[in-house]
UniProtKB/Swiss-Prot annotation:
Mg(2+) binds at D29, S58. Its cofactor is Mg(2+). One of its GO terms (cellular component) is cytoplasm. Keywords: Lipid biosynthesis, Lipid metabolism, Magnesium, Metal-binding, Phospholipid biosynthesis, Phospholipid metabolism, Transferase. GO terms for biological process: glycerophospholipid biosynthetic process. This is Geranylgeranylglyceryl phosphate synthase. Sn-glycerol 1-phosphate binds at Y178, L179, E180, A181, G182, S183, G184, G209, G210, G231, T232. Homodimer. Its EC number is 2.5.1.41. It comes from the Bacteria. It comes from Flavobacterium johnsoniae (strain ATCC 17061 / DSM 2064 / JCM 8514 / BCRC 14874 / CCUG 350202 / NBRC 14942 / NCIMB 11054 / UW101). Belongs to the GGGP/HepGP synthase family. Group II subfamily.
Length: 243
């Protein structure tokens, strides 16, 4: 029964896309969590419209991720999905993991090497593994993921290249496309880029980075995002959704 539950997250995302239901993930970076405030934070998450919790960061110790996920599983009913920065960020306590391949860059570590390292570990867990084409988009400032991965994001005005990259990911077998402006981005992913990609790929589109208010979430949805990720804005203001 447990395995059946754990293998439904991707299917739920597909069903939501089919039915026009928009999804929302709150991204928690364990490195930025103030543990004394965790209960209050989880209360706010439980009161929010969030449908998923993503956990991860560019540089996070695996033990910290384990501890946070354990707390989340105890105190929320939302699916907990690992958003890994490297192969050490794997915990069997989560429900699923985004199996990321950084398609916007040409660093082989983030295209395939870390995936090779992670595969044998993941095979020993019951985690639902969701293949995800990860595409960094220029956002007006250097973000942590660009710095750590030593890759350049795609030009935010080059819609053709962004679309071709997303389509390549789809053809390679990605189940999701994740358009990422980056944590603390000055500018979100361009709405026209979201629209062009969502109209020309069949798989669900995740959009994150640089979205600072509810209006920004709505605009991303209207452009074609199936799931929006909020991280820094919620970290900075746990009352983000109160308005």
């Amino acid at each position: 029964m447990e395995q059946k539950i754990l293998t439904t997250i991707h299917q739920q995302i597909l069903e939501a896309k089919k039915n026009g239901q928009k999804l929302l993930a709150i991204l928690l970076d364990p490195d930025k969590i103030v543990w004394e405030n965790l209960d209050h934070l989880l209360l706010k998450i439980n009161q929010s419209p969030a449908t998923h919790i993503f956990v991860g960061g560019s540089i996070v110790e695996s033990t910290i991720i384990e501890d946070l996920i354990a707390q989340l599983k105890q105190k929320t009913r939302l699916p907990v999905v690992i958003f890994p920065g490297d192969p050490s960020q794997i915990s069997p306590k989560a429900d699923a993991i985004l199996f990321l391949s950084l398609l916007s860059g040409r660093n082989p570590d983030y295209l395939i090497e870390y995936q090779v390292q992670a595969a044998p570990i993941l095979k020993k867990t019951n985690l639902e593994v969701i293949s995800t084409g990860y595409i960094l988009i220029e956002s007006g400032n250097e973000t942590a993921v660009a710095r750590v991965s030593k890759t350049e994001p795609l030009n935010r005005e080059n819609f053709d290249l962004a679309l071709a990259t997303a389509q390549a990911g789809e053809m390679l077998g990605s189940k999701l496309i994740y358009l990422e402006a980056g944590s603390g981005a000055k500018k979100p992913v361009p709405l026209e880029m979201i629209s062009v990609i969502s109209q020309n790929v069949e798989i669900p589109i995740i959009v994150g980075g640089g979205i600072v208010d509810l209006h920004g979430i709505k605009k991303a949805y209207n452009a074609g995002a199936d799931l929006v990720v909020i991280g820094t804005a919620f970290e900075n203001d746990s009352h983000f959704f109160d308005s």
